[in-house]
UniProtKB/Swiss-Prot annotation:
Species lineage: Bacteria, Pseudomonadati, Thermodesulfobacteriota, Desulfovibrionia, Desulfovibrionales
Any single GO BP term: L-histidine biosynthetic process
Keyword Amino-acid biosynthesis among UniProt keywords: yes
Function as written in the Swiss-Prot or TrEMBL entry: Catalyzes the oxidation of 5,10-methylenetetrahydrofolate to 5,10-methenyltetrahydrofolate and then the hydrolysis of 5,10-methenyltetrahydrofolate to 10-formyltetrahydrofolate.
Matches recorded under NCBIfam families: PRK10792.1, PRK14184.1, PRK14186.1
Name this protein carries in UniProt: Bifunctional protein FolD
Binding site for NADP(+): 164-166, 193, 234
Known pathway: One-carbon metabolism; tetrahydrofolate interconversion
Taxonomic source organism: Maridesulfovibrio salexigens (strain ATCC 14822 / DSM 2638 / NCIMB 8403 / VKM B-1763) (Desulfovibrio salexigens)
Length: 286
């Protein structure tokens, strides 16, 4: 079985971007700028933000974290977003989710300038994905497509099953797989908690994308021989971090698979860097 190593791939992408950013900085007088908004003290969010800061620093992107107390009002948070929208040194704005109770995350996401929406969550960018128009794509599904490209695993003409229908992963990934291109053009089925005969649907897939949030949900008997399995899940259990797939059991049947950790997670951050550089280039006219 081939291991789809997201950690190594993300490192390669970061090094490539560093070279590109160095050249752009020399030509345009500044580096790309990313603003990250973190509200409250959710431990997982703090780890994610720190990892993003480290990746930005190593790639040459100027990352500014706005750490805000959970008691912030909706109006104050919206004012910060508007301020960042107007800041010409900021190319990307990332609102770390989830927000504490009492804050309207959808309202905040809709306030972000679509040209700075490097997370790809603004309705305008979601709509552009639906229409097949250029725009920012959600980082996790876009990172998955990038990983498949790097390992030359085209989905064109293949049956792909996405297990999970979240707005962050499942829905946008399904839409990306239905676009035109070698690493799209798939026949896509989306499964979820109400799907009848879910195991049968997964068994028919050439590509399985598991994003359901249940530890080791995808079993060996659910996957056909030679399938490519992409595990989006990150679940904390007594045995440590595990994915949505039973990795050890699937090694006997999958032709290629992402590990957890070290698979999709690093690619999400790599795609954030790619999107931020894209936003920067559009802003400076590169």
């Amino acid at each position: 079985m081939q291991i789809l190593n997201g950690k190594e791939t993300a490192l390669t992408i970061r090094e490539e971007l560093k070279v590109e950013i160095d050249g752009l900085k020399e030509k345009h007088g500044r580096a790309p700028g990313l603003a990250v908004i973190l509200v409250g003290e959710d431990p997982a969010s703090q780890v994610y933000v720190r990892n993003k800061e480290i990746a930005c620093e190593k790639a040459g992107i100027v990352s500014t974290a706005h750490r805000i107390d959970a008691s912030v009002s909706q109006e104050e948070l919206e004012a910060l977003i508007q301020k960042l929208n107007a800041d010409d040194t900021i190319d990307g704005i990332l609102l770390q989710l989830p927000l504490p109770k009492g804050l309207d995350s959808q309202r905040c996401l809709e306030l972000i300038d679509p040209g700075k929406d490097v997370d790809g969550f603004h309705p305008m960018n979601v709509g552009k994905l639906m229409l097949g128009l250029p725009g920012f794509r959600s980082c996790t599904p876009a990172g998955i497509i990038t990983l498949l490209e790097r390992y030359n695993l085209p989905t064109s003409g293949k049956k792909a099953v996405v297990v999970g229908r979240s707005n962050i992963v499942g829905k946008p990934l399904a839409m990306m797989l239905m676009q035109y291109g070698d690493f799209a053009n798939a026949t896509v089925t989306v499964c979820h908690s109400r799907t009848d005969n879910l195991a049968e649907e997964v068994k028919a897939a050439d590509f399985v994308f598991a994003a359901i949030g249940i530890p080791k949900f995808i079993k060996k008997e659910m996957v056909k021989d030679g399938a490519v399995v992409v595990d989006v899940g990150i679940n904390r259990t007594d045995e440590g971090l595990v994915g949505d797939c039973d990795y050890a059991a699937l090694e006997d049947v999958a032709s290629a698979m992402t590990p957890v950790p070290g698979g999709v997670g690093p690619m999400t951050i790599a795609q954030l860097l790619i999107n931020t550089v894209q936003a920067y280039k559009e802003h400076v006219g590169a």
